[in-house]
Amino acid sequence: MLPASRVVDALKAFRAEFPTVSLRLNIEALGAVMQMVVNRVATLGVGGPFDEVVPGIERVGVGTVELIPVAAPNHPLALAGQTTPGAGRGHVQLVLTDRSSPHAPDRGVIGTQTWRLGDLGSKHMLLREGIGWGYMPEPMVREDVEKGRLVHLDMAEIKSGSIRLFAIYRTDTPPGPAGSWLIARFASQSEVGS
């Protein structure tokens, strides 16, 4: 969920600040970020939403990301302009699924026919091809909306919303200087609206 521009900004600055420190980057979604930190696969995770408090995990707020409903310009919901309440239920909704838990709660699902996808890249691809509609992080689809490849849907029952993003780490293995610097970088990005 963290916008790519923020990841790239932080990692370029990290490389300049800590040129001898190795880094391993995994891109995961939803609960898989938490799972990697809990299971000690990753020392530090950045993502969200993390609604529940997990014992032994520290959370540091690093901003928000806006989610907007979008579809391809030829999709019936895009062609309709402003829709009536319930219009989204009659169309395939593409939903990001939490691969870390088959019992994770759904978020923002109103469609009666859903296609569940494991990553935002495949969801983005299918949205652009008109296969369904769904929520996406606004920074990820901004250029597509500006260039007319996707349409920000005006749906009566759905409005855009933001999710909170956090840096997380285990309290028994707090980040060292490089990890602490990276958390501070992500937090400072959110202060300037990056």
Language-model segments: residues:
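Structural motif
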Residues: 1, 50, 97-99, 171
